[in-house]
Amino acid sequence: MTKCLGCGIEIQTISQNDLGYTSNLDNDLCERCFKLKNYGKYTKVTLDNYDYLKIINSISENSLIVYTTDILNLTINNIDKFKKVIIVVTKKDILPKSIKDEKIINYIKTRYKNVIDIVVISSIKNYNLDHLYNKIKQHANNNPVYLIGNTNSGKSTLINKIIDNYSNKSNKKVTTSMYPSTTLDKVEIDLGDLKLIDTPGLIDNTNIINHLDNKEVKTITPKKEIKPKSCQINGKGSLIIDKFVRIDYETITNNSLVIYASNNLNIRFNSLKKEISKNFNNTEFNLKPKQDIVIPGLGFIKFVGPIKVNIYCDKNIKPYSRDNLI
């Protein structure tokens, strides 16, 4: 059985409409990965999490797990069964340089007790990759290392950077993009002294990225350092985040908020709005002091004081509150 070196799917020449199609079984990439890699043409694939969970359940609890999570979301799932987990917080380059790694590491430490290390990285900037690679080798004990995480968490980008930095250059790279579900099955990478296994990303249906078209995904995906937008607020008003989210707020004292999201988004403040998209649902939060609202896949809003907020967004998206990350 020959697998696509980009996404891990089994290669076939029978049906052009099915996954894994290629015109020649000698090709390294399926047609989907070839077009994505060479022309930036993305073909969306609708998957469920059955195969992902099947892979996770097949991994020994004693295996070393490298769990990647996007710094804007910090979504961490399916690690409870494993005894050795390194959490890798990706995309450090999109947060302001003033935000220290220790703040993020300590935040995760207080919430996840069964991790052996937490490393904040930027694959794009090569930041902390030597440190991470040494940690992986230290804990691997010559056994395969599994990389898991949600779709679009930076998993495949990290693997390609590891191939660039530490392999003998004969390894083929896995397919990467800003779009969800690029990896479709397990992809094994043999680095000589280390074997990595990339797995398909868990599809989080509460994440906005899984409900947008390609152009919208480009709009909400930060490509460079975020410039936080802050505002002093009092009384009632609305925060509009492009066409994706509306947040109505009500505070009885002076308050402030800071928005961490892509610089491409049109963000504005208005007096309390009444019109609501028919596809938007309302979620109400009564926030305590120093809490965030996270819009999965989009970013987060930091509030300083207590405040009541109503969040209107796509009915599939599930915003949530947490203690201030920053």
At which residue positions do the language-model features occur?
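Hydrophobic positions on the alpha1 helix immediately C-terminal to the Walker A/P-loop
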Residues: 158
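Well-ordered alpha-helical segments embedded in enzymatic catalytic cores
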Residues: 51-55, 77, 103, 131
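Canonical P-loop GTPase G-domain recognition
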Residues: 94-153, 161-165, 173
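Short, well-ordered alpha-helical microsegments
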Residues: 74-77, 129, 155, 185
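Helix-rich effector regions associated with P-loop NTPase G domains
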Residues: 2-65, 69-72, 83-86, 92, ...
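A structural signal for isolated positions on well-ordered beta-strands in alpha/beta enzyme cores
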Residues: 66, 86-87, 119, 146
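Conserved ATPase-coupling elements of RecA-like P-loop NTPase cores
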Residues: 76-79, 96-102, 206-209
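Alpha-helix C-terminal capping segments
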Residues: 56-60, 74-83, 108-112, 136-139, ...
